[in-house]
């Protein structure tokens, strides 16, 4: 006869030896033995964890010897079931014997019993509220009549496995508060974002080696020409341009801020033995890759520092040339006049300055000529400065008036005549004389700020800068000093072939601010308006006419000699021919009290045509 229960239960098999007689079964002397066998299962190791038994005097286990006194099932927040079972006997002596018997039974009957020490064996056999339910406990009771009874109770066993229920609150707090190690970045945390592809190392994670890092730097535009560059790309030879910067990048990538080139150099020497890198003999900071990958991105090593240095050199040379020109063009003024004013324009291909923009003028006694080059030769835009200086003995106050003019191209159909007005407006009109002159209104507020109209004491000094109309790009020296040398011998000579026009008006009209020029007059050699000669004074002017000074260049012979000395090699015969011919122009200067015509032309020097 056999009885089989489920997998976690026990199998009780009674061996009868073939005796089926009721008399034989009822005889206590031949009562069959009880054989307890284990059914193989996953939880069989924990089957006898909480089994308790009581040894009776008649060596039989009765039901009354095993008593379950208390069972508690508590549901807490973690849905853990806590089962507390206390084994109680009739007296204290039986309790000790019961514990010893249970320990002996567990150590003997279990195939692989758990090791229990004395701390775990106490009156409360099962653990406290933090335990898990593992497997049911099977209580076997055999009465004197030979009828076995099976009773199952739930068992709770203390486990050491990591689980949310089994961990104590302190352990849970430790796990929650533990800081995770930040992942290693894929690229150095620097200004150049270098994307380096990670490679597996025997399937044990990702890492970037130093030689891979150097290859990544060589493929990055932000670092290749600046920190590291190829010297012989086909041979795999490269140079560390800035070894400190490369070592800092490698240190940031490895999270080592104290990385230097010596430490990185030891890693590079390790690659010599591996056959990855080689040191190029005779050259400092130059290495060679033994094997070059095929999918490299090559960057043209155009060193930006060279372009920066070249631009700095060009800028410094431009600044030096402008300083030299300024020193050459400095006007020598009278000893009593001090101070100065300078107008400086930035060199470069910038837009032409607007003639309406105000020019900064302080207390000028000398003005530095500045030239702004333009990309196209037409229209030629040149800035000139005109000084009207009064001698110190006539006026105690320092008086200097500066204005800038802009000349259009000589080949324009209609020459534009402009008067750029400063705070003290000096009307100066310059135009090519070989072309028609149209009507223009010249506003005049005050001619010279420091001159009293009622006083006519003292002669005037004029500094003029003119450009020949036939050569727009050839500029003569612009600082032409007109000085009064001898009262009886004026040095201004106007030949009949040159046409000059003088603005004639009365004093009141000029003071009111209106001056007009005849519309489109026909200029020729036979109809001059005002003619000067060496032996005669100013002629053909009615009373009340404002006397204006008309200035021309020097005579042809002297001008030719000056041009031949100072001209560049690129000035051909056309330039010399144009220099020989006197350049006619019309200039109008007016004052309320009139100017003396006894002035002399002083040509300082000629400017090189390509000086600006």
From Swiss-Prot:
Positions with biased composition (Basic and acidic residues): 562-577
Localization (cell): Nucleus
A GO BP entry: positive regulation of transcription by RNA polymerase II
PTM-bearing positions, type Phosphothreonine: 190
Annotated region described as Disordered, given as residue ranges: 156-199, 300-361, 562-586
UniProt feature, compositional bias: Low complexity: 305-322
A Pfam short name: Elf-1_N
Keywords: Activator, DNA-binding, Nucleus, Phosphoprotein, Transcription, Transcription regulation
Domain of life: Eukaryota
Protein name per UniProt: ETS-related transcription factor Elf-1
Organism (species): Mus musculus (Mouse)
Gene for this chain: Elf1
């Amino acid at each position: 006869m056999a009885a089989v229960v489920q997998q976690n239960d026990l199998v009780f098999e009674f061996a009868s030896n073939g005796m089926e007689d009721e008399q034989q079964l009822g005889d206590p002397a031949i009562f069959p033995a009880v054989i307890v066998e284990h059914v193989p299962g996953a939880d069989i190791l924990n089957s006898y964890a909480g089994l308790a038994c009581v040894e009776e005097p008649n060596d039989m286990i009765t039901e009354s010897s095993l008593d379950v006194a208390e069972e508690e099932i508590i549901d807490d927040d973690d849905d853990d079931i806590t089962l507390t079972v206390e084994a109680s006997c009739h007296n204290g002596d039986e309790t000790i014997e019961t514990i010893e018997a249970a320990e002996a039974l567990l150590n003997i009957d279990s195939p692989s019993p758990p090791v229990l020490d004395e701390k775990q064996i106490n009156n409360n056999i099962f653990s406290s509220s933090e335990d898990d339910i593992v497997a049911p406990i099977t209580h076997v009771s055999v009465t004197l009549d030979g009828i076995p009874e099976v009773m199952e109770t739930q068992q709770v066993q203390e486990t050491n496995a990591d689980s949310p229920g089994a961990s104590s609150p302190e352990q849970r707090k430790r796990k929650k508060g533990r800081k995770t190690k930040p992942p290693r970045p894929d690229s150095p945390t620097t200004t150049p974002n270098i994307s380096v592809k990670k490679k597996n190392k025997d399937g044990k994670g990702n890492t970037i080696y130093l030689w891979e890092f150097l290859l990544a730097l060589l493929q990055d535009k932000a670092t290749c020409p600046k920190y590291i560059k190829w010297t012989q790309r086909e041979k795999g030879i490269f140079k560390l341009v800035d070894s400190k910067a490369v070592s800092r990048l490698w240190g940031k990538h490895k999270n080592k801020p104290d990385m230097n080139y010596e430490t990185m150099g030891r890693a590079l020497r390790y690659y010599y033995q591996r056959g990855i890198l080689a040191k190029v003999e005779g050259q400092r900071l130059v290495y060679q890759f033994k094997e070059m990958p095929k999918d490299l991105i090559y960057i043209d090593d155009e060193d930006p520092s060279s372009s920066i240095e070249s631009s700095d050199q060009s800028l410094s040379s431009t600044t030096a040339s402008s300083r030299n020109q300024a020193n050459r063009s400095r006007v020598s003024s009278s000893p009593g006049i001090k101070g100065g004013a300078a107008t400086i324009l930035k060199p470069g291909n910038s837009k032409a300055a607007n003639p309406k923009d105000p020019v900064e003028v302080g207390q000028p006694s000398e003005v530095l000529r500045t030239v702004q080059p333009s990309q196209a030769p037409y229209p030629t835009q040149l800035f000139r400065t005109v000084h009207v200086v009064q001698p110190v003995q006539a006026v105690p106050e320092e008086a200097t008036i500066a204005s800038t003019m802009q000349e259009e191209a000589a080949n324009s159909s209609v020459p534009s005549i402009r008067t750029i007005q400063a705070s003290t407006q000096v009307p100066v009109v310059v135009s090519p004389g070989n072309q028609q002159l149209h009507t223009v209104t010249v506003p005049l507020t005050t001619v010279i700020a420091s001159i009293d109209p009622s006083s006519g004491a003292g002669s005037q000094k004029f500094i003029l800068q003119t450009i020949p109309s036939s050569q727009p790009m050839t500029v003569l020296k612009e600082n032409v000093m007109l000085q009064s040398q001898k009262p009886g011998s004026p040095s201004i000579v106007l030949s009949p072939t040159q046409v000059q026009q003088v603005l004639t008006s009365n004093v009141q009209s000029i003071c009111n601010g209106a001056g007009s020029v005849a519309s489109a007059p026909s200029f020729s050699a036979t109809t001059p308006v005002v003619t000067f000669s060496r032996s005669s004074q100013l002629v053909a002017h009615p009373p009340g006419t404002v006397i204006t000074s008309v200035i021309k260049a020097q005579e042809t012979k002297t001008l030719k000699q000056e041009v031949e000395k100072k001209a560049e090699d690129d000035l051909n015969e056309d330039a010399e021919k144009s220099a020989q011919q006197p350049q006619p122009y019309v200039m109008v200067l007016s004052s309320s009290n009139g100017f003396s015509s006894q002035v002399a032309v002083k040509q300082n020097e000629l400017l090189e045509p390509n000086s600006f």
